[in-house]
Amino acid sequence: MSNISSLNPFSGSSRTLVENKQVGASDAESLLKEMFSLEAQKEYAKECNLGRYTELKANRRLNHIDLVPKVHGMKMLSMFRSEYDKGNVPSSGVLNIPRILLYLVRTSHSSTVGSITIRLVDTYSASDSCLLEAIDGQEFTVDLSSLPCMIGFSPTYDCKLEMVDGRRRCFGIVTELNGVIGEGHTVAMVHAYWKAMFRTKPGNYTRVKPAAKFIAPFDRLKQLSSGQLDAFIKGISNNSIDHGYLMGSTINNIKKKTNVKEESPTSDPQSGEVSSMTQSVPGAADTRIPKPRRR
């Protein structure tokens, strides 16, 4: 087990992958296989909200996310402590997270009053002051009306794997709504991306201020070409919808479908690429007439 120096359990993102590690003796291998299996990945995702947006509701001022799931963190703590007591590793383990990137998007109107404060925290601080405070100035406040934006945090140290006042110590993200008025609707959504590693050797890192990048909302009408704009207008005015059989029409008078180029919801508006499609109403009759077979 002495060859364990670092483990990469997962990345917290919408494309979360777990890298299996085959290290140490047979007992350690069994434990690691269990911790990094596909079944474990599902547990990580469920407990940490990996790959999912966190909804910020008006009636819930505070939200917290641990950057390592509780069950997985406890297993790592137990494994490293056991190997440390045997003299196989130089420490009982630390959690290393180089950086955390958060994407915030507004789900309320642009004149919504209030702001969001986001903090990178170390859960040990809750045992001292009953309040999760930002570590090393890793805190940023943004007005709801200024969204969308991206925020980056970076801790200056590795978090020790240990229990403090009966709670597992871990890095986490806290979001706090300020001055938001409402009865429970979602005012914004947050998606966090990060990479977690477990190491036996701790480190310290240069202190940097939180970085924020505001994103200009997409102006559909300004960015579309004349052809795309024409298709867009036809689409929203229902001129391109196929309503199927019309009352009073005969089988010989049914008009053929017309393909209209419209803005593709999955294509990049900047590239000018659009997809050719025909819209239809669910449940409407199909107007296509089968061609007669030649004998």
Swiss-Prot record:
GO cellular component, one term: host cell plasmodesma
Cited InterPro entries: MPV (IPR000603)
Protein location: Host cell junction, Host plasmodesma
Keyword Ubl conjugation in record: no
Keywords attached to this entry: Host cell junction, Transport, Viral movement protein
The family this protein is said to belong to: Belongs to the bromovirus movement protein family.
Role noted for this protein: Transports viral genome to neighboring plant cells directly through plasmosdesmata, without any budding. The movement protein allows efficient cell to cell propagation, by bypassing the host cell wall barrier. Acts by forming a tubular structure at the host plasmodesmata, enlarging it enough to allow free passage of virion capsids.
Name by which UniProt lists this protein: Movement protein
